[in-house]
């Protein structure tokens, strides 16, 4: 694999840092402004070089579809988890507001525990949770569950799941994933050149995504808790 120039490494680091901080990649214009690259053509030249050298994948139709490859993660210090990473793009996230020992979790629409449906990214409500249960992580948000594919894990229709935004998941984690632009809740398993999204309802079949389709699949976060209203 060809070595990176200092400038290419700088661009790659900026992309990775923006994904880590914001949950989605920067635009070409944002890269240029941050790194003082005067033209979008100049930024594109660096992106093409990173792609050609195997450090970046991107979708030319989508301005934010810039995904560091496993090789890039090794260069940037994330090689230990590289094989377990599904490409990640934008995910809803609203900062938590501490209120004594309570934090407010924003509820950002709905997600399917059944057939994938599009999650609506708007704040519908907030719930207050003791920080002892979820900590004070500012990258936690809530989604309202529809469907019954995760009833074996105690996630029922109408429940609210708490989701920690992050770039990776481990085998067996319950995740919110975007598959072909629709969101769903499933357990994730990495199986060689494919990823299996497994429901816990035995009446429902898993969803398989092969490596060639990773571009249209992304992890939006890992489920860290469930909230249920009674009465």
From Swiss-Prot:
Source organism per UniProt: Anaeromyxobacter sp. (strain Fw109-5)
E.C. number: 3.4.21.88
DNA-binding region per Swiss-Prot/TrEMBL record: 28-48
Purpose of the protein: Represses a number of genes involved in the response to DNA damage (SOS response), including recA and lexA. In the presence of single-stranded DNA, RecA interacts with LexA causing an autocatalytic cleavage which disrupts the DNA-binding part of LexA, leading to derepression of the SOS regulon and eventually DNA repair.
Any one Gene Ontology molecular-function term assigned to this protein's record: DNA binding
GO annotation (BP), single: DNA replication
Protein's UniProt name: LexA repressor
Membrane-spanning parts: none
SUPFAM superfamilies: LexA/Signal peptidase, Winged helix' DNA-binding domain
Record-stated family: Belongs to the peptidase S24 family.
Catalysis: reaction(s): Hydrolysis of Ala-|-Gly bond in repressor LexA
Cross-referenced PANTHER family: LEXA REPRESSOR (PTHR33516), LEXA REPRESSOR-RELATED (PTHR33516:SF2)
């Amino acid at each position: 694999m060809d070595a990176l120039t200092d400038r290419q490494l700088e661009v790659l680091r900026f992309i990775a840092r923006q994904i880590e901080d914001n949950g989605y990649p920067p635009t070409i214009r944002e890269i240029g402004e941050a790194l003082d690259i005067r033209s979008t053509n100049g930024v594109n030249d660096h992106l093409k070089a990173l792609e050609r050298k195997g450090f970046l994948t991107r979708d030319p139709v989508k301005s934010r579809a810039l995904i560091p490859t496993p090789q890039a993660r090794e260069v940037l210090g994330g090689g230990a988890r590289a094989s377990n990473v599904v490409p990640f793009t934008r995910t809803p996230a609203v900062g938590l507001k501490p209120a004594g020992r309570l934090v407010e979790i924003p509820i950002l629409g709905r997600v399917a525990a059944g057939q994938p449906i599009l999650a609506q990214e708007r704040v519908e409500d907030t719930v207050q949770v003791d920080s002892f249960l979820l900590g004070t992580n500012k990258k936690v948000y809530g989604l309202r569950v529809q469907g019954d594919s995760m009833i074996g894990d105690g996630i029922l229709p109408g429940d609210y799941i708490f989701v920690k935004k992050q770039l990776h998941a481990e085998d067996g984690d319950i995740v919110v994933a975007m598959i072909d632009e629709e969101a769903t809740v499933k357990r994730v398993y990495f199986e060689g050149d494919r990823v299996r999204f497994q429901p816990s309802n035995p009446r429902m079949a898993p969803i398989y995504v092969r490596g060639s389709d990773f571009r249209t699949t992304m992890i939006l976060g890992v489920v860290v808790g469930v909230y249920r209203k009674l009465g």
